[in-house]
Every structure is written in structure tokens, then in C-alpha cells.
Regions:
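Active-site beta-loop-alpha junctions enriched in small/polar residues
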Residues: 17-21, 42-46, 78-82, 116-118, ...
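Charged helix-capping and loop-helix junction motifs
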Residues: 53-60, 89-97, 130-138, 190-198, ...
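Short, well-ordered alpha-helical microsegments
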Residues: 23-26, 163-167, 227
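Short, well-ordered coil/turn segments that N-cap beta-strands
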Residues: 9-14, 35-38, 67-73, 106-109, ...
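N-terminal pre-domain/capping segments
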Residues: 1-98
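Acidic/histidine-rich catalytic cores of soluble enzymes
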Residues: 39, 140-223
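Active-site acidic/histidine proton-transfer and metal-coordination neighborhood
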Residues: 67, 84-177
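Alpha-helix-loop-beta-strand connector modules within alpha/beta enzyme cores
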Residues: 59-76, 135-148, 227-235
Length: 235
């Protein structure tokens, strides 16, 4: 029998992603529940019409595993889409809705969404959203909202190579929340503790990961003072 070694910090709910080991959803989650009280179910690739998403049978099995282990869920929505055109925005919105409807059975506290015009990473800083892009995204969010248990359950994530105020108009114009990706801010050479007081009223959850040549690495790569600067204000 595996001895649990859950990461717990007073005052914070610590989680992990659904793939701390390279395996399919069900065996991977069976491993995750030994280490965290909150699991981010990664549904990053939906495909053209949702064919790449997790199956309803897998969702039912994950619900049982989580209930037995007493863990909670958040869901990272598909990232293989964007709002570059009306057509791409329509397809992306449909897949976001598919993913939300599929995972409602898990009763996630948050669904995390990327808001991009081009989902293929590039080396340059993205420009601010145009008025037309903003209107397109707001229409999409209006379509997504009825599928949520509450509007604030949808959290828009800040991304690297995007201006820090990229999401400001969207957050202020909707009842949705922020997912504060701290690692993305570090990756841009900025100080997340300076953004925290500005964004805190809208933050629903945070992504915390280290940097070592790239992001999404162990926090062991980060200096203690760097971690303290952002974590202490949260306590």
C-alpha cells in the first residue's frame, strides 16, 4: 500500500496536474490522489470537434476515484484553438463548451481558459486585442457562461508573451475570474508580487511552477526569496 505524502501548506489549497506520471487519465489520477488534495484535469487538445477529449466513461471512473480519495478538481480547458477569425472562434467556443459539459459531473471549483487569437506559440510579444477581437471573445464568453454552475467558475489565465493588461477589459466586462499564472510572469522577467494586489480581487486560483530553461519546471529551481515574495502575501 502506498504511503501518502500530500503537499499541504496552511492557508493554501495545493494541487497538481493530472499528469505527474506519463500515463492515461485513469492510472495517472490514481497516482495523483496520493500527493495532492486538488487535481487539475488537463484537457488541452480537443481536436476539430472534441474527438480528442476524455470520454464520459473515463469521467465517471475519475469521479469515483476522487470521491474515495476526498480530492477536488479544477479543469484546464482545451488550448488548441483561438479567436483569430469568426470561424476559429466558433470552433474553439464549441470545444470549450463540450469540455465544460463533459466535466460537470466532477463538480470542479474552476475551469481555466486560455484567451488567444493564435494558439501556436511564437517568439514575439503579442499585441493587445483589437476591438473586433474583444467583441468576438465577449460573444464567446456569453455563450459559455450558461454552461457553468456560476460565472466566476471560469478563470481566464494570463499567458507568456502577452501584455500583463491583456485580459483586463475582458475581466472587467464579465463576471468571470482570473487564473494567476505566476510562472508565466516570471518567464517574462517580471515580478508577480507587483501584479498580485492589482489582480487579487479577481483571482480564483494560481498556477505556480519553476523555470529552468523553460517554464513548468520544479520549484526547486527558484530561489527561496523569489518564492517568499509571492507566497507570503497570499498567507
Amino acid at each position: 500500500m502506498k504511503t501518502p505524502h500530500k503537499c499541504r501548506v496552511p492557508g493554501l489549497n495545493i494541487g497538481c496536474t493530472s499528469f505527474i506520471i506519463p500515463d492515461y487519465y485513469v492510472p495517472a489520477i490514481r497516482e495523483c490522489v496520493h500527493y495532492a488534495d486538488d487535481i487539475a484535469l488537463l484537457l488541452l487538445e480537443a481536436g476539430e470537434h472534441g474527438e480528442g477529449l476524455i470520454t464520459p466513461a473515463e469521467i465517471r471512473e475519475l469521479a469515483g476515484i476522487a470521491a474515495d480519495a476526498g480530492v477536488k478538481w479544477n479543469v484546464h480547458l482545451p488550448t488548441d484553438g483561438g479567436f483569430a477569425t469568426e470561424e476559429s472562434g466558433r470552433r474553439y467556443t464549441e470545444n470549450i463548451i463540450r469540455a465544460i459539459d463533459l466535466t460537470r459531473e466532477l463538480e470542479p471549483h474552476t475551469w481555466v481558459m486560455h484567451v488567444v487569437t493564435d494558439h501556436i506559440p511564437g517568439p514575439d510579444m503579442r499585441p493587445h486585442l483589437t476591438e473586433r477581437e474583444t467583441e468576438r471573445i465577449l460573444r464567446s464568453l456569453e455563450q459559455i457562461t450558461p454552461h457553468l454552475p456560476a460565472p466566476e467558475c471560469l478563470a481566464l489565465e494570463n499567458l507568456e508573451r502577452h501584455p500583463t493588461d491583456y485580459l483586463d477589459k475582458l475581466v472587467s466586462a464579465t463576471p468571470h475570474s482570473r487564473c494567476f499564472d505566476i510562472g508565466h510572469v516570471w518567464k517574462e522577467g517580471l515580478r508577480p508580487e507587483e501584479l498580485l494586489p492589482l489582480w487579487l480581487p479577481d483571482i480564483r486560483m494560481c498556477h505556480l511552477h519553476g523555470l529552468e530553461k523553460r517554464d513548468h519546471k520544479s520549484l526547486h529551481h527558484m530561489a527561496a526569496a523569489t518564492l517568499d515574495a509571492i507566497l507570503h502575501p497570499m498567507w
